[in-house]
Curated annotation (Swiss-Prot):
GO terms for molecular function: structural constituent of ribosome. It comes from Cyanidium caldarium (Red alga). Coiled coil: none annotated. This is Small ribosomal subunit protein uS2c. The gene is rps2. Pfam families: Ribosomal_S2. It is found in: Plastid, Chloroplast.
Length: 243
């Protein structure tokens, strides 16, 4: 589904940062300056959304897995919702350092979380004391805070989508070390060369983040639907994505 100029304008996707905070490498994506604010060229935003969606469709059809990353307040809920809709993974709290570059350790943490949650389900049999139960619940809560969105991940993701890469420097660094392609929604204060597919937009606007992330999620959803890649209940989100 094509992105329209009016959609982006309504979402304030064109409003960048003040000219004093810009990154000169963002220049190709700037339309004009107005009252000390850089205005983003939304035609290029539309083009880049299209590039990102085509890339995702192609890769997902080939079985590639995607991780959505958005830890800022404006992105957190959107990232979780859209990742779940297309049955992919997400990180919306602090990035667990080494998630990509030290995957064996992260995998052990995921296994630990799985075992603790399985043990918790058996508590009704009286297999643990109240003190042990309280300690176990605290540990589960702690692990879930950062790992809940990557349960079921068997290996590092093949593609990462980031909201505001300037806040996700560790993620970017790990991706670059492992040559994992990245798609980034980024504002005028960011370096577009920090990601493989930059999408210029106001990354402080919840509406803009919501609009663009949902477009990316929809492209993943449709690619999976074509290939019958959904695990279960694949049609429950169909209406959301094919409107």
């Amino acid at each position: 589904m094509e992105t329209s100029l009016s959609e982006l304008l309504d979402a304030s996707a064109h409003i960048g940062h003040s000219t004093s905070k810009w990154n000169p490498k963002f220049f190709p994506f700037i339309h004009m300056t107005k009252k000390g604010i850089h205005i983003i060229d939304l035609i290029k935003t539309i083009q880049q959304i299209s590039v990102a969606c085509m890339f995702l469709k192609k890769e997902v059809r080939n079985g590639k897995r995607v991780l959505f990353v958005g830890t800022k307040n404006q992105a957190s809920k959107v990232v979780e919702r859209e990742a779940k809709k297309c049955q992919e993974f997400y990180i919306n709290q602090r990035w667990p350092g080494g998630l990509l570059t030290n995957w064996p350790t992260i995998k052990l943490s995921l296994k630990k979380l799985q075992l603790l949650e399985e043990k918790e389900k058996l508590d009704h049999l009286g297999s643990t004391s109240k003190k042990e139960e309280a300690s176990m619940k605290r540990e589960i809560q702690k692990l879930n805070k950062y790992l809940n969105g990557i349960k079921g991940m068997k290996k590092p993701p093949d593609i990462i989508i980031l909201v505001d890469p300037s806040r996700e420097k560790t993620t970017i660094s790990e991706c670059q070390k492992l040559n994992i392609p990245t798609i980034g929604i980024l504002d005028t204060n960011c370096n577009p060369k920090s990601v493989n597919v930059p999408i210029p937009a106001n990354d402080d606007s919840i509406k803009a983040i919501d609009l663009i992330v949902s477009k990316l999620s929809t492209s993943i959803f449709k690619a999976k639907l074509e290939n019958n890649q959904f695990i279960e209940n694949s049609t429950e989100n169909l209406n959301e994505h094919v409107k």
